[in-house]
Swiss-Prot record:
The keyword Transferase appears for this protein: yes
Protein encoded by which gene: xpt
MF-aspect GO terms: xanthine phosphoribosyltransferase activity
Protein's UniProt name: Xanthine phosphoribosyltransferase
Gene Ontology BP annotations: purine ribonucleoside salvage; xanthine metabolic process; XMP salvage
Family: Belongs to the purine/pyrimidine phosphoribosyltransferase family. Xpt subfamily.
Length: 192
């Protein structure tokens, strides 16, 4: 998605450890117009698929997830990183490792929001090593849902998460696929 790639090049900051900081439009402050375009693009990419629900993970997955769900006309559910006191005990759990925070944690979705046989589209803000996606796939499988595919706003394809998704036999679509970081610059797949 050219618009997204241009925004990453303009406003993104490459940090040590192959981390891309895009806090000005996705991971802290959100650009709703850009996220609406993200939702439209995921709708276009997954056209023809029967999708009943979008599954994402809090917090940065919510903006692209809700815009995608809005475009598709379906509900969105997000996996929580902590179980609030208002959640009952009927919960699907999965372990995830945060690449940027360097901590293991659990994510959860209340069972009443995922139903056997539902067609689920997983949307994530970043897919690097794919830990959050692995957790969401695990939760969708616990609920006996059909996973239509995984959509990443940004994929760092050199870190293996997108390969894991494909190795699981799942469709993977990324709106901005990063091949490498060199000299503090982002290099997208297909660039010279």
């Amino acid at each position: 998605m050219k618009l997204l790639e241009e925004r990453i090049k303009r406003d993104g900051e490459v940090l040590d450890g192959n981390v891309l900081k895009i806090n000005s439009f996705l991971n802290h402050q959100v650009d709703p117009k850009l996220m609406m375009e993200v939702g439209k693009e995921f709708k276009r990419l997954f056209a023809g698929e029967q999708i009943d629900k979008v599954l994402t993970c809090e917090a940065s997955g919510i903006a692209p997830g809700v815009m995608t769900a809005y475009q598709l006309g379906v509900p969105m559910v997000f996996a929580r990183k902590k179980k609030p006191s208002t959640l009952n005990d009927a919960v699907y759990w999965a372990d995830v490792f945060s690449y940027t925070k360097k901590v293991n944690s659990k994510i959860c979705v209340e069972e009443k929001f995922l139903h056997e046989g539902e067609n689920i589209l997983i949307i994530d803000d970043f897919v690097a090593h794919g830990e959050a996606v692995k957790g969401m796939v695990n939760i969708a499988k616990q609920a006996h849902c059909n996973i239509v595919g995984v959509g990443a706003v940004v994929a760092k394809t050199f870190q293996g998460g997108s390969d894991w998704v494909k190795d699981e036999g799942l469709r993977f679509e990324s709106l901005a696929s990063i091949a490498s970081f060199k000299d503090g610059q982002v290099h997208f797949e297909g660039e010279e």
